[in-house]
Regions:
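Intrinsically disordered, low-complexity terminal and linker regions
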Residues: 1-118, 219-234
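Segments that shape or occlude catalytic/ligand-binding pockets
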Residues: 11, 35, 96-234
Protein backbone atom coordinates (compact mmCIF):
# COMPACT_ATOMS: atom_id res chain seq x y z
CA UNK A 1 0.00 0.00 0.00
CA UNK A 2 1.47 3.35 -0.98
CA UNK A 3 1.74 6.26 1.46
CA UNK A 4 -1.09 8.19 -0.18
CA UNK A 5 -3.46 5.24 0.38
CA UNK A 6 -2.79 5.04 4.12
CA UNK A 7 -5.37 6.46 6.54
CA UNK A 8 -3.93 8.78 9.16
CA UNK A 9 -6.87 10.68 10.62
CA UNK A 10 -10.54 10.20 11.44
CA UNK A 11 -11.38 12.73 8.71
CA UNK A 12 -9.37 10.77 6.16
CA UNK A 13 -11.22 7.63 7.26
CA UNK A 14 -14.55 9.36 6.68
CA UNK A 15 -13.40 10.71 3.31
CA UNK A 16 -12.55 7.18 2.18
CA UNK A 17 -16.01 5.94 3.13
CA UNK A 18 -17.76 8.92 1.56
CA UNK A 19 -16.00 8.32 -1.75
CA UNK A 20 -17.10 4.69 -1.73
CA UNK A 21 -20.68 5.79 -1.05
CA UNK A 22 -20.52 8.33 -3.90
CA UNK A 23 -19.17 5.64 -6.22
CA UNK A 24 -22.01 3.28 -5.33
CA UNK A 25 -24.61 6.01 -5.79
CA UNK A 26 -23.11 7.13 -9.08
CA UNK A 27 -23.31 3.64 -10.57
CA UNK A 28 -26.92 3.28 -9.46
CA UNK A 29 -27.97 6.59 -11.00
CA UNK A 30 -26.53 5.61 -14.38
CA UNK A 31 -26.75 8.22 -17.12
CA UNK A 32 -27.68 11.01 -14.72
CA UNK A 33 -24.21 10.75 -13.22
CA UNK A 34 -22.42 9.26 -16.23
CA UNK A 35 -19.57 11.74 -16.47
CA UNK A 36 -18.82 11.82 -12.76
CA UNK A 37 -19.04 8.03 -12.48
CA UNK A 38 -16.62 7.55 -15.36
CA UNK A 39 -14.08 9.80 -13.66
CA UNK A 40 -14.45 7.83 -10.42
CA UNK A 41 -14.02 4.52 -12.26
CA UNK A 42 -10.92 5.77 -14.04
CA UNK A 43 -9.47 6.90 -10.73
CA UNK A 44 -10.01 3.44 -9.26
CA UNK A 45 -8.72 1.55 -12.26
CA UNK A 46 -11.32 -1.11 -11.43
CA UNK A 47 -14.30 -2.31 -13.44
CA UNK A 48 -17.42 -2.07 -11.29
CA UNK A 49 -21.07 -2.17 -12.21
CA UNK A 50 -24.39 -3.07 -10.69
CA UNK A 51 -25.13 -6.74 -11.29
CA UNK A 52 -27.97 -6.84 -13.81
CA UNK A 53 -28.22 -10.63 -14.12
CA UNK A 54 -31.26 -11.32 -11.94
CA UNK A 55 -30.63 -15.05 -11.75
CA UNK A 56 -27.07 -14.48 -10.55
CA UNK A 57 -28.24 -11.87 -8.03
CA UNK A 58 -30.79 -14.35 -6.69
CA UNK A 59 -28.08 -17.01 -6.45
CA UNK A 60 -25.80 -14.68 -4.51
CA UNK A 61 -28.64 -13.63 -2.21
CA UNK A 62 -29.40 -17.27 -1.43
CA UNK A 63 -25.69 -17.96 -0.95
CA UNK A 64 -25.40 -15.19 1.63
CA UNK A 65 -28.59 -16.02 3.52
CA UNK A 66 -28.13 -19.80 3.48
CA UNK A 67 -24.57 -19.60 4.87
CA UNK A 68 -25.44 -17.58 7.97
CA UNK A 69 -23.87 -19.51 10.85
CA UNK A 70 -26.22 -20.68 13.59
CA UNK A 71 -23.78 -19.55 16.28
CA UNK A 72 -24.33 -15.95 15.09
CA UNK A 73 -28.13 -16.13 15.36
CA UNK A 74 -28.18 -13.73 18.31
CA UNK A 75 -25.46 -11.42 16.96
CA UNK A 76 -26.18 -8.09 15.32
CA UNK A 77 -24.79 -9.33 12.00
CA UNK A 78 -27.55 -11.95 11.70
CA UNK A 79 -30.05 -9.21 10.81
CA UNK A 80 -28.03 -7.91 7.85
CA UNK A 81 -29.27 -8.95 4.42
CA UNK A 82 -28.11 -8.12 0.87
CA UNK A 83 -29.69 -5.14 -0.86
CA UNK A 84 -27.34 -4.43 -3.79
CA UNK A 85 -24.80 -6.44 -5.76
CA UNK A 86 -21.86 -4.99 -7.66
CA UNK A 87 -19.79 -6.98 -10.14
CA UNK A 88 -16.10 -6.09 -9.89
CA UNK A 89 -12.92 -6.79 -11.79
CA UNK A 90 -9.57 -5.53 -10.55
CA UNK A 91 -7.46 -5.92 -13.72
CA UNK A 92 -4.02 -6.80 -12.32
CA UNK A 93 -5.50 -8.97 -9.58
CA UNK A 94 -7.72 -10.88 -12.02
CA UNK A 95 -4.87 -11.38 -14.50
CA UNK A 96 -2.63 -12.68 -11.71
CA UNK A 97 -5.32 -15.19 -10.70
CA UNK A 98 -6.11 -16.31 -14.25
CA UNK A 99 -2.46 -16.86 -15.22
CA UNK A 100 -0.90 -18.12 -11.99
CA UNK A 101 -3.52 -19.17 -9.45
CA UNK A 102 -6.61 -20.66 -11.05
CA UNK A 103 -4.82 -23.69 -12.44
CA UNK A 104 -4.00 -24.86 -8.91
CA UNK A 105 -7.62 -26.03 -8.68
CA UNK A 106 -9.91 -26.80 -5.73
CA UNK A 107 -11.72 -23.50 -6.28
CA UNK A 108 -14.12 -22.39 -3.56
CA UNK A 109 -16.48 -19.41 -3.58
CA UNK A 110 -15.85 -17.55 -0.33
CA UNK A 111 -16.56 -14.38 1.61
CA UNK A 112 -14.18 -11.67 2.78
CA UNK A 113 -15.31 -9.01 5.22
CA UNK A 114 -13.64 -5.69 5.91
CA UNK A 115 -14.68 -2.36 7.40
CA UNK A 116 -16.28 0.13 5.02
CA UNK A 117 -13.29 2.43 5.42
CA UNK A 118 -11.05 -0.25 3.86
CA UNK A 119 -13.27 -1.12 0.91
CA UNK A 120 -12.08 1.63 -1.42
CA UNK A 121 -8.42 0.68 -1.11
CA UNK A 122 -9.37 -2.98 -1.67
CA UNK A 123 -11.29 -2.00 -4.80
CA UNK A 124 -8.25 -0.09 -6.06
CA UNK A 125 -5.57 -2.71 -5.51
CA UNK A 126 -7.20 -5.93 -4.35
CA UNK A 127 -6.33 -7.54 -1.05
CA UNK A 128 -2.90 -7.09 0.47
CA UNK A 129 -1.28 -9.26 3.12
CA UNK A 130 -0.08 -7.08 6.02
CA UNK A 131 3.34 -7.87 7.46
CA UNK A 132 3.53 -9.82 10.70
CA UNK A 133 4.23 -6.68 12.76
CA UNK A 134 1.44 -4.58 11.24
CA UNK A 135 -0.73 -2.82 13.87
CA UNK A 136 -4.51 -3.24 14.16
CA UNK A 137 -4.63 -6.57 12.33
CA UNK A 138 -7.49 -8.86 13.40
CA UNK A 139 -7.15 -12.61 13.45
CA UNK A 140 -3.86 -14.25 12.45
CA UNK A 141 -4.82 -17.57 14.05
CA UNK A 142 -3.38 -19.23 10.96
CA UNK A 143 -0.36 -17.11 10.21
CA UNK A 144 0.16 -14.58 7.46
CA UNK A 145 -2.23 -14.74 4.53
CA UNK A 146 -5.51 -13.66 2.98
CA UNK A 147 -8.41 -14.91 5.12
CA UNK A 148 -11.79 -16.02 3.79
CA UNK A 149 -14.93 -17.53 5.28
CA UNK A 150 -17.57 -19.97 4.08
CA UNK A 151 -20.13 -18.32 6.36
CA UNK A 152 -21.50 -14.90 5.40
CA UNK A 153 -21.99 -13.93 9.04
CA UNK A 154 -18.46 -14.96 10.03
CA UNK A 155 -17.02 -12.60 7.41
CA UNK A 156 -19.79 -10.07 8.00
CA UNK A 157 -18.64 -9.63 11.59
CA UNK A 158 -15.36 -8.22 10.25
CA UNK A 159 -17.32 -5.83 8.03
CA UNK A 160 -19.38 -4.77 11.03
CA UNK A 161 -16.37 -4.23 13.29
CA UNK A 162 -17.35 -6.95 15.76
CA UNK A 163 -13.72 -8.10 16.05
CA UNK A 164 -12.46 -4.72 17.24
CA UNK A 165 -12.34 -2.93 13.90
CA UNK A 166 -13.65 0.56 13.20
CA UNK A 167 -17.44 0.68 13.02
CA UNK A 168 -19.11 2.81 10.40
CA UNK A 169 -21.57 5.48 11.49
CA UNK A 170 -23.88 4.27 8.70
CA UNK A 171 -26.18 1.26 8.90
CA UNK A 172 -24.80 -0.56 5.87
CA UNK A 173 -21.83 -2.89 5.52
CA UNK A 174 -20.03 -4.41 2.52
CA UNK A 175 -19.06 -8.01 1.89
CA UNK A 176 -16.74 -9.28 -0.85
CA UNK A 177 -17.34 -12.56 -2.67
CA UNK A 178 -14.28 -14.22 -4.20
CA UNK A 179 -13.05 -17.33 -5.92
CA UNK A 180 -10.16 -18.93 -4.03
CA UNK A 181 -8.00 -21.64 -5.59
CA UNK A 182 -7.06 -23.74 -2.59
CA UNK A 183 -4.79 -26.02 -4.60
CA UNK A 184 -3.08 -28.43 -2.24
CA UNK A 185 -4.56 -27.41 1.11
CA UNK A 186 -3.58 -28.33 4.65
CA UNK A 187 -6.48 -29.32 6.91
CA UNK A 188 -6.51 -28.27 10.55
CA UNK A 189 -9.13 -28.23 13.29
CA UNK A 190 -7.22 -25.87 15.56
CA UNK A 191 -5.23 -22.65 15.28
CA UNK A 192 -1.98 -22.76 13.33
CA UNK A 193 -0.04 -19.54 14.04
CA UNK A 194 2.97 -20.78 12.05
CA UNK A 195 0.90 -20.45 8.88
CA UNK A 196 0.65 -22.52 5.73
CA UNK A 197 3.11 -25.44 5.91
CA UNK A 198 5.81 -25.77 3.28
CA UNK A 199 4.57 -27.58 0.18
CA UNK A 200 0.94 -26.44 0.57
CA UNK A 201 -0.99 -23.69 -1.21
CA UNK A 202 -3.47 -22.91 1.55
CA UNK A 203 -5.05 -23.88 4.86
CA UNK A 204 -8.60 -25.11 5.34
CA UNK A 205 -9.40 -24.59 9.01
CA UNK A 206 -12.49 -26.68 9.67
CA UNK A 207 -15.16 -26.20 12.30
CA UNK A 208 -16.19 -28.93 14.69
CA UNK A 209 -13.55 -29.13 17.38
CA UNK A 210 -12.01 -25.87 18.61
CA UNK A 211 -13.41 -23.76 15.75
CA UNK A 212 -17.01 -22.64 15.29
CA UNK A 213 -16.73 -21.73 11.60
CA UNK A 214 -14.59 -22.77 8.65
CA UNK A 215 -11.85 -20.43 7.48
CA UNK A 216 -9.73 -20.58 4.32
CA UNK A 217 -6.30 -18.97 4.30
CA UNK A 218 -3.75 -18.60 1.53
CA UNK A 219 -0.42 -16.76 1.73
CA UNK A 220 -0.35 -16.42 -2.07
CA UNK A 221 -2.41 -13.55 -3.48
CA UNK A 222 -2.47 -15.10 -6.95
CA UNK A 223 -4.70 -17.83 -5.50
CA UNK A 224 -7.72 -15.54 -5.19
CA UNK A 225 -9.79 -12.99 -7.10
CA UNK A 226 -12.60 -10.74 -5.91
CA UNK A 227 -15.76 -11.05 -8.04
CA UNK A 228 -18.47 -9.10 -6.23
CA UNK A 229 -18.96 -6.52 -3.53
CA UNK A 230 -22.36 -6.70 -1.84
CA UNK A 231 -24.09 -4.03 0.22
CA UNK A 232 -26.02 -5.35 3.24
CA UNK A 233 -28.43 -3.58 5.57
CA UNK A 234 -30.43 -4.64 8.63
Amino acid sequence: ISTENMIYTAQKLQDEYDLLTQLSTGVQMGSAMAGNTKQQMNALGTDIEILKDRAEADRLRDFIISTKASNHRHDEVWNYNPVRFFKIRIPKERERYETRGKQKGNIKECFHGSSSSNCLSILKTGLVIPPVNAPHVCGRMFGTGAYYGLSSTKSGRYSLGSWGGKRSKYDNIFLFIADVALGKYYTTYDSLPSGTPRGYDSIWAKAGQSLYNDELITPYLENQTLKYIVELRP
